[in-house]
Amino acid sequence: MSGHSKWSQIKHKKALTDKKKGQIFSKLGRLITLAAKKGTDPRSNPSLSQAIDNARAVNMPNENIERAIKKVSDKSQVQLEELSIEALGPGGIALKVRAITDNRNRTMAEIKKILTENNSKLVQPGSLTWMFNQPLTLGDSSIQEQLDKLFEALDDQDEVEDVSSNLAN
């Protein structure tokens, strides 16, 4: 019966759930900090109020919420910025990636690497806007698999907040 302790089983499951919680809390913390730039009072700042409500919905500790708001007033803290990135995905699919980061160059390099590994490429901002008015449908299952892999890789990236495409639902 060696190696079958109950704690070792729980430990592995707990590590996975803690990692997922940490990623969610990080994303929500960045959203709160970004929203708090417009004002640190949730009563007068609806976007901050919404971000706090979202954080509370997933049981984010109040200490983390307060720390995220405090980052805005503390000038020694690193400032966050929002990036809007456009890319051309597999099969000519238009992608918009929204990210919140404290280091623009690092985030752009990481997203560019993910796109390159998944048969996609960055394009100039605004050059694909027209494509979102013309939804595409996929007939090739291999392209759908590539897109699923790309969306999963982008979703695993901590700074990425939202990914949208011109695929018809």
Give each language-model segment a name.
Residues 1-136, 168:
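N-terminal cationic and glycine-rich segments that engage phosphates or anionic surfaces
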Residues 122-169:
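Positively charged, low-complexity, intrinsically disordered RNA-binding extensions
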